[in-house]
Regions:
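PLP-dependent aminotransferase class I/II
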Residues: 8, 37-42, 47-54, 60, ...
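Hydrophobic residues in well-ordered beta-strands that form the structural core
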Residues: 84, 105, 157-159, 203, ...
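N-terminal "arm"/small-domain region of PLP-dependent enzymes with the aminotransferase-like
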Residues: 1-30, 308, 352
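Phosphate-binding glycine-rich loop
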Residues: 30, 34-81, 95-99, 105-106
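Active-site phosphate-binding strand-loop segment of PLP-dependent enzymes
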Residues: 111-194, 201-202
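Short beta-strand->loop structural element characteristic of the AMP-binding/adenylate-forming
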Residues: 102-112, 313
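Conserved coil-to-alpha-helix start sites within the AMP-binding
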Residues: 87-93
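Helix C-cap/helix->beta junction micro-motif
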Residues: 99, 152-153, 308
Length: 373
């Protein structure tokens, strides 16, 4: 069996150092808000090229705290609008709606799978306060045009970097340093994954950093003094220690992903399958390798590969605007039709890719795909 991703194998790549890090924390006896957090936050800020990194419980919380902080700072208020890609994972939209903000869904480009920057300006209203870009699948979503739109309309640019650890923009900036603030997820399956949940906010804004740090600690900037109504959303010391180990190997692990991706690009040849545009290497961290399967054959290919011992996953089979939880929301008009987003939900299939996959496994996957009938 070739798994979609074996977390056991991924962890084993750096297992000795990870075990040493966990043991160090256990023996130290300090499990929250200690030196491990300080060290990781400092190192991850350096990696992303930002001044501030604030660890938190998970990637969803990271995004929630960014928007909540902007509300506390007076930059936004409930009812304001945030433009967001319609084909994102639902967490991006949850972070917006959890703060009483209104998501305005923007279609992606079918050849890149990222937000269509040609459509953004037409969605802006007097209530628009931010654009949230999502570097989906590890592919860069930022463009010079998006930056210009933000400047023209004085909009905040928020990055969802849950899938883009180590990805760079066309101008060389690492994701997480491009916008005004960025949310990161360290879910175990990510390019930089913990041994449980974890997240972080990166920014160059000192006020935002201070408010986010307080919100993630019950709303407190001083012990037993609560300026905001926050929540317990802290990154624990064990996860911080593990992440600091894995951060050292992120560039090398991403390089392996790129080698696998290039093999897919060069050797997958099937009339039903379309691959997204090949980006310059630095502009794709290859968190996932999405393919589009036409003529209603996505599920058949998924089942065929499963039967032949290959795990694949659909990202994502139900678009956010079609989810039951948002069925009655005012912003989610029943007549809302997003043909590109809905097509991607019907056709996308992610192939195995990761730092532990072997060359012979990749070759077997390609052979099976090309033989699919």
């Amino acid at each position: 069996m070739i798994p979609f991703l074996s977390l056991k194998d991924v962890t084993a790549l750096h297992g000795e150092e990870i075990n040493e890090a966990v043991t160090r924390v256990v023996n130290n006896g300090w499990y929250l808000q200690g030196k491990e957090n300080e060290r990781f936050e400092e190192n991850y800020a350096k990696f992303t090229g930002t001044k501030y990194c604030i660890g938190c419980a998970n990637g969803l919380d990271a995004l929630i705290w960014i928007f909540r902080a902007y509300i506390e700072m007076g930059a936004m208020q409930p009812g304001d609008e945030v433009i967001v890609p319609a084909n994102t994972y639902i967490a991006t939209i949850l972070a917006i709606t959890e703060n009483g903000l209104k998501p305005v869904l923007c279609e992606p480009k079918p050849n890149t799978l990222e937000i269509d920057d040609d459509l953004i300006e037409g969605l802006i209203t007097p209530k628009t306060k931010a654009i949230a870009i999502v570097h989906l699948y590890g592919r860069i979503a930022y463009s010079e045009k998006i930056g210009e739109i933000c400047k023209k309309y004085h909009l905040k640019l928020v990055e969802d970097c849950a899938q883009s650890h180590g990805c760079k923009s066309y101008d060389g900036r690492v994701t997480g340093s491009i916008g005004d603030a960025a949310g990161h997820s360290f879910y175990p399956a990510k390019n930089l994954g913990a041994l449980g949940d974890g997240g972080a906010v990166t920014t160059n804004d000192p006020e935002l950093a201070s408010v986010v740090r307080a919100l993630a600690n019950y709303g407190s900037q001083k012990k037993y003094v609560f300026k905001y109504a926050g929540r317990n959303s802290r990154l624990d010391e064990i996860q911080a220690a593990v992440l600091d180990v894995k951060l050292k190997y992120l560039v090398g692990d991403n390089l392996h992903r790129k080698e696998v991706a290039h093999y897919y690009y060069e050797h997958i040849h099937h009339p039903l399958i379309t691959l997204p545009d090949l980006l310059p290497d630095d502009q794709n961290a290859y968190h996932l390798f999405p393919i589009l399967v036409g003529e209603g054959q996505r599920d058949a290919l998924h089942a065929y590969l499963e039967q032949n011992g290959v795990g694949t996953v659909c990202h994502y089979p139900i678009a956010p605007h079609q989810q039951e939880c948002y069925a009655k929301e005012e912003w989610n008009n029943p007549q809302l039709i997003l043909p590109v987003t809905e097509r991607l939900a019907d056709e996308e299939l992610s192939l195995p890719i990761g730092p532990s996959i072997k060359a012979e496994e990749v070759k077997e996957i390609v052979k099976l795909i090309n033989q699919f009938k």
